[in-house]
Amino acid sequence: MAEVANNEQQEPQFNIQRVYTKDISFETPNSPAVFQKEWNPEVKLDLDTRSAKLADNVFEVVLSLTVTAKNGEETAFLCEVQQAGIFAINGLTEQQLAHSLGAYCPNILFPYARETVGSLVGRGTFPQLNLAPVNFDALFAQYVNQRQEGAEEAAQTEEASA
């Protein structure tokens, strides 16, 4: 019986406690003039994630999206959304936890953020905006590689100065 209890404690657990919109901003700095011009936008998406420990095994993950649409040289709209979630995560190694917070949780939050951006753009009376899916696993792997390269460079610099 004690063996079963130990196995249950080591079993990874992942629960979504809450998904919510933390911050929203939508600006059309050049309206109404922007509506009078031919619509040929250049859309740029910037995204960022951050996480914070709220309690033992409870984390907040925030996915920030900034979408800028320029029509020629003028900004047509600027949309910023911070989509957040509170996640209870237990039984993972440090590396697995980092991956969950940096890739898995943002992957859960992205559809909510994408829907919010699309809704705001529509309310601004701009044509429908469909954001392409994001490969958060690849972005997280790139982030880990950059950190490792930075640590190696710092170690080499330290050795050279010693």
Curated annotation (Swiss-Prot):
A GO CC term attached to the entry: cytoplasm
One Pfam family in the UniProt entry: SecB
Compartments where found: Cytoplasm
Ranges in a coiled coil: none
Key words, A-Z: Chaperone, Cytoplasm, Protein transport, Translocation, Transport
GO MF term (any one): unfolded protein binding
Primary residence: cytoplasm
Keyword Lipid biosynthesis in annotation: no
Gene3D superfamilies xref list: SecB-like
GO terms, biological process: protein folding; protein tetramerization; protein transport
Homology family: Belongs to the SecB family.
HAMAP family attached to this UniProt entry: SecB (MF_00821)
UniProt-listed NCBIfam families: PRK05751.1-4, secB
Biological function: One of the proteins required for the normal export of preproteins out of the cell cytoplasm. It is a molecular chaperone that binds to a subset of precursor proteins, maintaining them in a translocation-competent state. It also specifically binds to its receptor SecA.
Subunit structure: Homotetramer, a dimer of dimers. One homotetramer interacts with 1 SecA dimer.
Name of the protein in question: Protein-export protein SecB
Originating organism: Shewanella sediminis (strain HAW-EB3)
